[in-house]
Amino acid sequence: MKPPQRGRGGGVRGGRGLARGGEGSAVRGSGRGGESGRGRGPGRVKSESDGGIKGGSKVLVTPHRHAGVFVAKSKADALVTKNLVPGEIIYNEKRIFVQNEDRSTVEYRVWNPHRSKLADAITTGVDNIWIKPGVKVLYLGASSGYTVSHVSDIVGPEGCVYAVEHSDICGKVLMNMAEKRTNVIPIIEDARHPAKYRMLVGMVDIIFSDVNHPEQANILSLNASYFLKSGGHFMISIKANSIDSTIAAETVYQMEVEKLQMEELRPTEILHLDSCEEKHACVFGGYRLPRK
């Protein structure tokens, strides 16, 4: 059985594969704008560092349609987030400094879609990431915090990222990063056992699950039962070979979708990602959504 795609498969629809931001929807399959997003007029600014764009060149930084995400446009476009802690870098990432008309400076960090599944999903054309300023996120499989740091930028000082990582080595890097980013709460625990960290995590708006484990769907559903608000949302990264390398990736995706549906996790969109890894997909959806 093939995994659900646009226009079939119980309402789960595939992305349209656009690398641009804009108003176009990954579900609707129609483009209604460019990278500048909805309605907010960008200002032309000047770059003061390379940041993926040649230093000193004129750069146009515009809001992406996903709140808290931006696009720096020049000879080479780059996905960026506004640095929550100006002056601090996480992984020697490139930065772009732009000067506003009032002479204030804003610092942006370049977000590489080849290193982050969430960034890859955005450039592929996901309809909604549900992560936006002010929300609370539970991130399972935080690793050393590359994507977590950009999620931290997006949710801002009013939001919060609970970052769960099992590896002590990655956990140390994650904790060092969180010293400056006060909206990141590192939790060095096994995501398979949420009862161990239930006293540290409040109810969240979205769970982002990037746990490379054969039981990853069950891990997500168990954490959702503890922490995800009814009507909240989720994203799960599925690496087919980690679940069953003996069958077709499409079959694996369908099996995982069916597991999620059994646990009140309703998938609404599936994207095949190529930038990070082969045979990899991300499923987005909602939890205990009201029936239409």
Swiss-Prot record:
It is an enzyme of class 2 (transferase). It is found in: Nucleus, Nucleolus. The gene is FIB3. S-adenosyl-L-methionine-dependent methyltransferase that has the ability to methylate both RNAs and proteins. Involved in pre-rRNA processing. Utilizes the methyl donor S-adenosyl-L-methionine to catalyze the site-specific 2'-hydroxyl methylation of ribose moieties in pre-ribosomal RNA. Site specificity is provided by a guide RNA that base pairs with the substrate. Methylation occurs at a characteristic distance from the sequence involved in base pairing with the guide RNA. The keyword Membrane does not apply. Not detectable by RT-PCR. This is Putative rRNA 2'-O-methyltransferase fibrillarin 3. GO terms for cellular component: nucleolus; ribonucleoprotein complex. GO terms for biological process: methylation; rRNA processing. It comes from Arabidopsis thaliana. Pfam families: Fibrillarin (PF01269). GO terms for molecular function: methyltransferase activity; RNA binding. Belongs to the methyltransferase superfamily. Fibrillarin family. The keyword Membrane does not apply. NCBIfam families: PRK04266.1-2. S-adenosyl-L-methionine binds at Y146, T147, E165, H166, D190, A191, D210, V211, N212, H213. Residues 7-42 have a biased composition (Gly residues). Component of box C/D small nucleolar ribonucleoprotein (snoRNP) particles. It comes from the Eukaryota. Its main location: nucleus. Its EC number is 2.1.1.-. Residues 1-58 are annotated as: Disordered. PANTHER family: RRNA 2'-O-METHYLTRANSFERASE FIBRILLARIN 1-RELATED, RRNA 2-O-METHYLTRANSFERASE FIBRILLARIN. It catalyses: L-glutaminyl-[histone H2A] + S-adenosyl-L-methionine = N(5)-methyl-L-glutaminyl-[histone H2A] + S-adenosyl-L-homocysteine + H(+).
